[in-house]
């Protein structure tokens, strides 16, 4: 039986740090389901269809990565995709409080699904979607080293029109 993990996020946009985390999680699990959240209540740079499409493009050559969008409870989506674990990244101690609360709630909702925390590779520890968006607003050309090429193309399209 395959060990499947789900990696949820808004991914607005997906960064090289996210990609690194998926690739490293594949050393532990047979399959990773990248679950793109509808980001209820958030103003996003890209709508969910574009975010999902970019992530599919990033992992198009990896049969062990599946990309889905979801709304509602993460644990329900995990069950739907036969995931035994939720993968989350922890960049800094400041991430821990929120992630610990989410992990605890998910465990209360479904104790069969474990949360696995991975720290980023050092070169990606300061990259976040929020920071990529903040830099892109001022100079989109400066974010090319932080995101996959297909994501940079979308950022360029969005900001070169403004």
From Swiss-Prot:
Gene3D superfamilies: HUPs (3.40.50.620). Its EC number is 2.7.7.3. Its cofactor is Mg(2+). It is an enzyme of class 2 (transferase). Reversibly transfers an adenylyl group from ATP to 4'-phosphopantetheine, yielding dephospho-CoA (dPCoA) and pyrophosphate. Belongs to the bacterial CoaD family. This is Phosphopantetheine adenylyltransferase. It comes from Francisella tularensis subsp. holarctica (strain LVS).
């Amino acid at each position: 039986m395959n060990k499947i993990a789900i990696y949820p996020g808004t991914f607005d946009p997906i960064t090289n740090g996210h990609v690194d985390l998926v690739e490293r999680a594949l050393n532990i699990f047979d399959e990773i389901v990248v679950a793109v959240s509808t980001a209820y209540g958030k103003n996003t740079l890209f709508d969910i269809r574009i975010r999902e499409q970019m992530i599919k493009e990033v992992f198009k050559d990896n049969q062990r990565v599946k990309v889905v969008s979801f709304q509602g409870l993460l644990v329900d989506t995990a069950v739907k995709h036969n995931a035994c674990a939720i993968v989350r990244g922890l960049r800094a101690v400041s991430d821990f409080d929120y992630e610990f609360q989410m992990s605890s709630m998910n465990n209360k909702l479904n104790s069969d699904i474990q949360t696995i925390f991975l720290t980023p590779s050092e070169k990606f520890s300061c990259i976040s979607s929020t920071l990529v968006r903040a830099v892109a607003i001022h100079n989109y050309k400066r974010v090319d080293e932080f995101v996959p090429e297909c994501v940079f193309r979308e950022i360029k399209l969005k900001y070169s029109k403004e």
